[in-house]
């Protein structure tokens, strides 16, 4: 009973706007994205030091990632929801109203990262490995934007941790239902655990307890995030669809395949590759991670 009482957290969004100053307004979504970027830069910079990557390059990379990821995330979403934007093309630019797709962001961010890595002559897999923990952390933070916007929620539920959705935000099929699965919370917690797992793997490799090679953390991210997304996407009421199939689930299955094949390639076909996480230098604090 005590556990049920502890988990009895009814979530109700205060609205998408944090504060309004005259004609200007600061929205929760924007604040969360900015916070995710700053925290991601800090985390990846710390990891980069142990991968012999200039930590100052991470801040430069962040600019490239934002430029590549956010427009791609929006365009990905709009492409699969074109019917609602065809008659309102100006709304395509209104990203503050919500409507971005993480898979689009990953595709756009990956393209930007590859271009950046080649320009700076940084090994791509080394760079992706120090970015994916921050990506998972950023997703954990960013999902709360869905909460404030009352979007990307699940099917109706009476669970103690239910999410209240205003009537004007409910799907027509569930217009009489007040409470829904807080899928934003599920994915936020899943991504936070994934971030902690990736950092733990990095530390284990740093201490030479695991033969961590370039690309392993990237593959683990692809597998870990996608497994959670397949489950959570099945609960959502607003999935992007291709016929009767949920696009996010299909993309996640492909990502899992890439992750598994990547691990086989790294450890099976490339056995001569050296371990790439260097041990801590004498006098260098492990607390940096």
UniProtKB/Swiss-Prot annotation:
It is a multi-pass membrane protein. Coiled coil: none annotated. GO terms for molecular function: phosphatidylglycerol-prolipoprotein diacylglyceryl transferase activity. Its main location: membrane. It is found in: Cell inner membrane. A 1,2-diacyl-sn-glycero-3-phospho-(1'-sn-glycerol) binds at residue 143. Its EC number is 2.5.1.145. It is an enzyme of class 2 (transferase). Keywords: Cell inner membrane, Cell membrane, Membrane, Transferase, Transmembrane, Transmembrane helix. The chain crosses the membrane at residues 21-41, 53-73, 95-115, 122-142, 182-202, 215-235, 247-267. Belongs to the Lgt family. Catalyzes the transfer of the diacylglyceryl group from phosphatidylglycerol to the sulfhydryl group of the N-terminal cysteine of a prolipoprotein, the first step in the formation of mature lipoproteins. This is Phosphatidylglycerol--prolipoprotein diacylglyceryl transferase. It comes from Synechococcus elongatus (strain ATCC 33912 / PCC 7942 / FACHB-805). The gene is lgt.
